[in-house]
Amino acid sequence: MKIIDAHVHIYPDKIAQKASQSISDFYNLDAAYDGKVSTLNEACELAGVSQCLVHSVATNPSQVGSINSFIRKTAMQHPRKFFGFATVHPLAKDIEFQIENAVAAGLSGFKLHPDFQKFFADGHEAMQTFEIIDGRLPVLIHAGDNRKPYSGPERILKLCKAFP
């Protein structure tokens, strides 16, 4: 049986510990791993996971380019194992450019995180982002954190109805 992990955050080694700790702190949970690609490979081997959707989240628009370069490079180094999902930032002035670059780079989809990126999943910026993506690639969107107002089920439902 093929096992695919559809939600894996990865980071460059130099920031992996800090980034993983930030997520652990945000959710008040212990991280399952340290965010490094080498550790992910080891964990996949032990668990029998054959493929992963890998991504990271730009918490501000200036991070998009470097994150997507890292994700693309990592996916290219592991072409049958990792499928890279681009980050875009819906509040960015150059959102269309970000999306077009990700598509042209051959990334496999998009990852959005309303709570970290501070946009409403049913707001104007999200709707505009989905209009530009126009169904060309799948979108993985964080949902349901009841501590923040951005990604509740009712907001995701509105987004899904607008873009079935």
Question: Locations of the language-model features?
Answer:
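Hydrophobic packing residues within well-ordered alpha-helices of enzyme cores
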Residues: 71, 156-159
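A generic "structured core" feature
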Residues: 2-11, 45, 98, 102-103, ...
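Acidic, amphipathic alpha-helical patches
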Residues: 40, 95, 99, 156
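Short, surface-exposed alpha-helical segments at coil->helix boundaries
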Residues: 34-38, 65-69, 150-154
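Histidine/acidic-residue-rich catalytic or RNA/ligand-binding cores of hydrolases
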Residues: 15-17, 150-157
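N-terminal cationic-hydrophobic initiation segments that often serve targeting/anchoring roles
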Residues: 44, 75-79, 160-161
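An N-terminally biased module of ancient metal coordination in phosphate/nucleic-acid-related enzymes
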Residues: 1-57, 61-62
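Active-site gating/metal-coordination segments in enzymes
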Residues: 50-51, 61-148
